[in-house]
């Protein structure tokens, strides 16, 4: 899909986002406990998203909240990155709780560097699926929808987390993830911010609430 000057497509080398099925931006901000909320422009917001993704000192400090997009509200930033082990448990529980409040909540991580994909699908307080390509042992639930179809097309009849990690099929799958990227799943389940036309309303910037971290992330040595 196309875009407009006022609402550019959201891109980042490592893109993490939460999406909640509601048009009430204020309630999402409240439910997340976000602080120091302020208006921004789309251009500045999108630029900030990529800057924060590269921020090694405070990667989890800032998020960008979109206006409603096709019935969903997105909150973007590494704070919601499932592959960052210091975040995984926290954001999983957070997404589950948000789904209990709003009906549906989802998390996604997409790497333009082809070094990882992740998603979490929650509905009505239940985790239906969590997949983190770098940590298959952390998978929850059953593949469904486009994930299931692409696995079947690749000849994987079970779950990818059950594959022999030293086997040929697992290695071939991991080379491209069978084109089953987070953006692919998001396109079917909710909103893919790399292609969706965003609302012309104004996004917000906010500080994310701190939480106790058991250890710093070491994924790819970036943070």
What are these regions (language model features)?
Residues 1-37, 219-223:
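Short, extreme N-terminal segment that most often corresponds to the first beta-strand
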Residues 115-116, 123-124, 128-223:
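Long, compositionally biased intrinsically disordered terminal regions
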